[in-house]
Amino acid sequence: MFIYCSFFCFRYGGKYMQKQFYPVIGTEKALPFYIIGIGVSCWQFPVSRPEGYDYPQLFVCLEGEGEVTVDGKTVKIMPDSIFYIPPHCPHEYRATTHSWYLDWVCFDGKQALELLKEWDLNKFHVFLNCGAERMHKLFDSAYYTIKSDKAYGNYYASAQLYDMLLEYRKLSDDKFPYKSRVNSEAVAKVMKYTEENYSKPIKLADM
């Protein structure tokens, strides 16, 4: 069983279709990573959590501007930015423009926090102008994966969630995960083509 809402944000004058999904968690609790809730292209209303939130949260800023306050420090969030808020961390976030559209995911799992702690990433982070397009695609894909398969969607999305966390780590490593991923994918395609066609004359244009 799944609970979700999907509606056009005419009320707020937005242009996106707001997509949010909350799967009912069952046997997924045995997974190392699983999604608690996910939103794609969502108009963001003001949020204040003096006690924090029970789960880690990862966000992608798509359009508009906002600000996040953690530990008394306020950070401006602009388009093409990503930020992470750890569980039980008091925080606030709000729009500073008429509309502020975010992707968001909250998650859990036996290995989720352990992995982030091992990577030294279970703390509030903001990455500005970081090439967030690939991360947005991962959010979008995970949303439809969960929504389209009631039996195993969150199992498949578990792998996509890990990919999100890996992108988050790459942000911390070099600040340019999207560019590095594009280059890696391009090299992988060339290698695959070369191996499959090694016995044939290969033209540069074919690659």
Regions found by a protein language model. Give the residues of each.
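Generic protein-terminus/edge-of-domain signal
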Residues: 1-81, 89, 95-97, 119-126
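Amphipathic, well-ordered alpha-helical segments in soluble domains
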Residues: 34, 57-60, 134-138, 160, ...
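Juxtamembrane segments at transmembrane-helix boundaries
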Residues: 48, 115, 142-145
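Residues that scaffold the ATP/ADP-binding catalytic core of kinase and kinase-like folds
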Residues: 69, 114-116, 193
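Ligand-binding loop in jelly-roll beta-barrel domains
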Residues: 87-111
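Short, Lys/Arg-enriched, Trp-marked, Pro/Gly-tolerant hinge/linker segments that flank
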Residues: 123-133, 146-206
